[in-house]
């Protein structure tokens, strides 16, 4: 029951987030834990799912890696879903971070191989609807002939250098991020492996509930209780330093609850 009290308090905080914006970092962490649980509930044979190892959440199987960067945003003024803009700082910060990770893997040949064995996914509760950049990325992934349009768009973003004193650190950072991405020699290969997914708090919670009910055969009336327990157990394990699971180790941990 302690876990239930703890997690219920957090879920109440999430529902009140528009009134208490100072809870932003906490809710962002809870969003990450929820997504971590979802990936654990859908783990496949041979996979290792981790938290804060290769990315916010990571999935590894053999040489293959999936980098999952989570960005949770709070709309403090309205209850509507926020839209991710083409120059959203979290978007370009994430792309820049992935570029930095790849560059650490060695020479260009090693980086190229790393990209080929990796998928890079930005998970956000901001909507990607009508985002031209994402639309162009998806079009390019389907047809290489669309690369030129995407390349021009990225190049244009990198040209928007802020004025020295007027635009502030945020715009300067966006400029640096866009420039680093644009200057990266293998950006064409990288963007072929980039995906953006929209996951609202409610949708993520519902996906977890469905996995618990229909995949784990838990009666509907017990689904919320099981979710509370799993979230509490995972949070406790993370505090103790357990941040990676295989399908076997997660099954063992869940069976002990």
Where do the language-model regions lie?
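Catalytic centers of nucleases
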Residues: 17-26, 30-97
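Acidic metal-coordinating catalytic centers involved in nucleic-acid phosphodiester chemistry
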Residues: 1-25, 73-257
């Amino acid at each position: 029951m302690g876990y239930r009290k703890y997690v219920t308090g957090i879920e109440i905080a999430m529902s009140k987030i528009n009134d208490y914006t100072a809870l932003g970092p906490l809710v962002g962490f809870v969003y990450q834990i929820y997504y971590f649980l979802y990936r654990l509930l859908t783990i496949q044979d041979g996979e290792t799912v981790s938290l804060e190892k290769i990315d916010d959440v990571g999935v590894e199987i053999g040489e293959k890696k999936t980098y999952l960067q989570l960005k949770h945003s709070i709309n403090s003024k309205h209850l509507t879903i926020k839209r991710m803009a083409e120059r959203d700082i979290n978007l370009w910060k994430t792309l820049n971070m992935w570029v930095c990770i790849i560059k650490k893997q060695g020479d260009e040949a090693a980086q190229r191989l790393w990209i080929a064995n990796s998928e890079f996914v930005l998970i956000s509760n901001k909507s990607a609807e009508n985002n031209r950049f994402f639309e162009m990325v998806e079009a390019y992934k389907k047809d290489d002939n669309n690369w030129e349009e995407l390349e021009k768009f990225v190049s244009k973003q990198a040209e928007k250098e802020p004025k020295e004193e007027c635009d502030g650190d945020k715009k300067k950072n966006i400029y640096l991020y866009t420039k680093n991405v644009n200057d990266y020699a293998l950006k064409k290969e990288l963007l072929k492996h980039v995906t953006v997914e929209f996951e609202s708090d409610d949708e993520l919670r519902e996906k977890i509930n469905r996995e618990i009910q229909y995949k784990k055969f838990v009666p509907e009336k017990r689904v919320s209780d099981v979710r509370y327990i799993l979230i509490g157990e995972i949070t406790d394990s993370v505090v103790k330093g357990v941040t990676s699971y295989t399908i076997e180790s997660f099954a063992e941990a869940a069976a002990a609850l």
